[in-house]
Amino acid sequence: MARSLAALLLLLVAAAGDSHAASPAEMYWKIALPTSPMPGAIRDLINPASSAGSASKEDTVGNVFFLEKDLFPGSKLTLHFTRATAGAALLPRGRADSVPLATEKLPEILSQLSVPAGSPAADAMSARPRRSPARRSNARRRSSPWWSSPRPASAPATCTPCPRRSTGQGRRRGRRTGWRP
């Protein structure tokens, strides 16, 4: 009885010791880089059975990506998508609406946003174009050949697509399509 118990114990120890044997890749790592330990990510790639106990359902890489050998007609794969967390906005809506957006009120803006005057952030904020948004868009229109000719009063407020664009031919290079009365 004692002999069979000892043999069984020896068999269990041999089986447990065999599962922790170093793979050829681990042996090569020890020979090539004897002073540096193998990173866990590489060890998990080499021996995925050792990392099976530590895998969790939250592991999105393992749940979304799969191996090519698993892709064949009729195979069923389970994908777990975690719910995306809503990121925090820069400022709450009420506070963002209360910030005055005028260059003459720059000191008030800096104080509301807790930006010290003279800091690089304050300098960047004061270096913005000093024109109003309406003046900027008008300047953009005047410099663009698209807006170079004024629209006649009889023209509709919205553009109608050219027949060439509606047939799917699209815009040719070097030729702009515009509004038509």
Swiss-Prot record:
Residues annotated as domain BURP: 65-181
Superkingdom, natural source: Eukaryota
Signal peptide: 1-21
Start and end residues of each stretch annotated as Disordered: 112-181
Alphabetized InterPro entries for the sequence: BURP, BURP_dom
A Pfam family this chain is assigned to: BURP
Tissue: Expressed in roots, stems, leaves and shoot.
Listed Low complexity bias regions: 144-157
Keyword terms of this UniProt record: Signal
Protein name from the UniProt record: BURP domain-containing protein 7
Organism: Oryza sativa subsp. japonica (Rice)
Primary gene name: BURP7
